[in-house]
């Protein structure tokens, strides 16, 4: 049986009961996003280092403008040139693959999770 972290990393859809949610991974991502969002514009090497630590796969050609927020980070994978503009939120409770040549506009939210809409 897979644990919650393995289920989240798997590309198949799942229903979460929020039991055993990897909170340490969430705290890690929040801390790294906080650090990233407080870097100076000229601290490109520091930004690169934080992204390499935060994201599951980070192409050297990935650029993300602050503010940036995500749930976990390990489920975000960039491939080739990927430009993510200001105020992006990625709710990566499942894998998110951002392909080469992707340009994401300001204020975009990519949400893998959803909430039940059927009251039953």
Sequence positions of predicted segments:
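Terminal amphipathic alpha-helical/low-complexity segments used for targeting or macromolecular assembly
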Residues: 1-61
């Amino acid at each position: 049986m897979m644990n919650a972290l393995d289920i989240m990393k798997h590309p198949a859809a799942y229903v979460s009961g929020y039991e055993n949610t990897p909170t340490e991974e969430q705290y890690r991502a929040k801390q790294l996003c906080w650090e990233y969002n407080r870097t100076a514009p000229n601290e490109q090497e520091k930004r690169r280092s934080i992204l390499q630590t935060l994201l599951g796969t980070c192409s050297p050609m990935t650029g993300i403008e602050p503010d940036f927020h995500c749930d976990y980070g390990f489920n975000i994978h960039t491939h080739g040139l990927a430009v993510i503009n200001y105020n992006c939120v990625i709710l990566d409770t499942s894998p998110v693959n951002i392909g080469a040549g992707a340009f994401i506009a300001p204020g975009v939210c990519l949400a893998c999770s959803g909430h039940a809409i059927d009251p039953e």
